[in-house]
Regions:
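A short glycine-rich, Lys/Arg-flanked "PGG" loop and its adjoining helix->strand segment in the class I
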Residues: 118-133
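SAM-dependent methyltransferase
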Residues: 138-209
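A short SAM/SAH-binding and catalytic strip from SAM-dependent methyltransferases
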Residues: 98-118
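Class I SAM-dependent methyltransferase SAM/SAH-binding core
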Residues: 49-91
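A short acidic, Gly/Pro-enriched loop at the edge of an enzyme's catalytic core
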Residues: 90-99
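Conserved class I S-adenosyl-L-methionine
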Residues: 1-36, 38-45
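C-terminal lobe and adjacent flexible extensions of AdoMet/dcAdoMet transferase-like proteins
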Residues: 204-246
Length: 246
């Protein structure tokens, strides 16, 4: 199952890039506060590369990974000096690095059938192994308050050459389903496409416990610097113990 095909990827970048762009200054300050002012940052679920572009401008090397080929095509245009590859964050080979980020509830998406609580534990262990001592993992995720509590929630947005309608419904106590209809102008007509996204919701306590079991020291976050998370989004900072060597 794939998500963020060509039209939704375009719309997400055109109309919803603010999350990554607004979070970037706070994210950079967190990196710097832990002595990470250069080196390789791996961005899991990099989307259209807006955060990767900010990292490159700040002097970091960047590897962005996303399951959507359409997003990766956009990212290569947005941040041509970064490296990108198509892949699932649940299975892609991670290189040794100084920091790993996953911004915008990427850990919740169930495009890959391997996604889930057990896979999350494996992912955190993989990240811990590849991080340099003193390296960090920064991520945010959707929790139970992201659910509309079994009431249908609809959202409509539009731009110069696009429109999108998303309907979100709870699917059991720990997941939500989004039905997304996109309309994108192609020539003199609008093309309609549909996608269905399923997200598994996580409690902050279970994320923190899994990180600690993987070896991280853990801090919870309400946002990245001055950028505050919207309702239902929570963040964590995982720190690999040890002195930085670079």
């Amino acid at each position: 199952m794939h998500g963020y095909l060509e039209d939704l990827a375009y719309i997400h970048d055109a109309g919803f890039r603010d999350y990554a762009c607004s979070a970037a200054p706070g994210l950079e300050r967190i990196l710097a506060s832990h002595g990470i002012v250069r080196g390789l940052v791996v961005d899991l679920g990099c989307g259209s590369g807006r955060w990767a572009g900010e990292l490159v401008r700040a002097g970091y090397d960047v590897l962005g990974i996303d399951q959507s080929p359409a997003m990766i095509r956009l990212a290569r245009k947005v941040a041509p000096r970064a490296r990108f590859q198509v892949g699932s964050l649940w299975s892609v080979r991670l290189p040794p690095c100084d920091a790993v980020t996953s911004i915008g509830e990427c850990l919740n998406y169930c495009f890959d059938p391997r996604a889930g609580r057990r896979a999350l534990s494996v992912l955190f262990k993989r990240v811990y192994r590849v991080l340099e001592p003193g390296g960090i993992l920064l991520c945010d995720f959707a929790g139970p308050h992201r659910s509309p509590h079994r009431k249908l929630r609809q959202h409509i947005s539009a731009g110069r050459d696009w429109a999108v309608m998303a309907s979100t419904l709870a699917s059991g106590p720990h997941s939500i389903v989004r039905h997304i209809a996109t309309y994108r102008r192609v020539g003199n007509r609008y093309r309609r496409r549909e996608e269905v996204h399923r997200l598994r919701l996580f409690l902050s306590a279970e994320i923190c416990n899994q990180l600690r079991r993987s070896g991280f020291r853990v801090r919870t976050l309400n946002g990245y610097g001055r950028f505050r998370f919207p309702r239902g989004i929570q963040g964590v900072l995982g720190i690999k113990p040890g002195p930085r060597t670079s």
